[in-house]
C-alpha cells in the first residue's frame, strides 16, 4: 500500500515538472512585435505574444 502511494506520488511529480514539448524552444523578447517573425517561422502564423520576456506562439485558428 505504501509503495503504491510513493510510486503514484513520484509519477505525478515527474509529469508536472517535465516541460511540454511545445515550449521547449524559448524565444526571448521585450515586446510583442519581436515575436511575430520567429513564431511565423515555427508555426506559420503571426499569432504571438510576449509574456514574461518570452514569446508565446499560438497556432493558426
Curated annotation (Swiss-Prot):
The record marks 58 as: Aromatic residue of the functional dyad. It is found in: Secreted. Its main location: secreted. Residues 1-23 form the signal peptide. The record marks 49 as: Basic residue of the functional dyad. Expressed by the venom gland. One of its GO terms (molecular function) is toxin activity. Keywords: Disulfide bond, Ion channel impairing toxin, Neurotoxin, Potassium channel impairing toxin, Secreted, Signal, Toxin, Voltage-gated potassium channel impairing toxin. Disulfide bonds join 29-50, 35-55, 39-57, 45-60. The keyword Cytoplasm does not apply. GO terms for cellular component: extracellular region. Has the structural arrangement of an alpha-helix connected to antiparallel beta-sheets by disulfide bonds (CS-alpha/beta). Belongs to the short scorpion toxin superfamily. Potassium channel inhibitor family. Alpha-KTx 06 subfamily. Inhibits Kv1.2/KCNA2 and Kv1.3/KCNA3 voltage-gated potassium channels. This is Potassium channel toxin alpha-KTx 6.9. It comes from Opistophthalmus carinatus.
